[in-house]
Amino acid sequence: MAALDRRLELDAKLREILGNDNTYFGPPASVIMHYPCIRYSRSYIDTVYADNNPYLRRKRYELILIYEDADDDLPDKLMDELTVAHNRHYVADNLHHDVFTMYF
């Protein structure tokens, strides 16, 4: 499967979990985001070698779930649907941010 196809598959899963189209892959600063949303980017590529050739590549993504209501169940929903590791939570500009890491 091509890398773009795989990322678009991830994007579709994120949209399904959110229940809207507010997913942003590495958006430029000029993009106006609508909430709740998920902003995500590739953070690392883990390569396994066999006989000095790349055998397996796993891409790690950082996902930031951004939402307004502190009682929103979106973080739980995301953790129920995907294999993610929760890294931290913070509030900025009166918006809640949950940062997750996942391989996809």
What are the residue ranges of the model-derived segments?
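Small/polar-rich, solvent-exposed N-terminal microdomains that initiate assembly or binding
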Residues: 1-45, 53
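A generic structural signal for short, non-catalytic loop/turn and secondary-structure boundary residues
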Residues: 31-33, 56, 93-95
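Short, cysteine-centered beta-strand-loop-beta hairpins and adjacent loop/turn segments enriched
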Residues: 47-48, 69-70
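Short, flexible, solvent-exposed loop/turn segments with mixed acidic/basic and small polar residues
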Residues: 49-56, 91
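Short intrinsically disordered coil segments
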Residues: 53-58, 78-81
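Oligomerization/assembly interface segments of phage tail-like spikes and tubes
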Residues: 57-69, 96-104
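Short, conserved charged micro-motifs
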Residues: 70-77
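Acidic-leaning, charged glycine-interspersed low-complexity segments
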Residues: 77-104
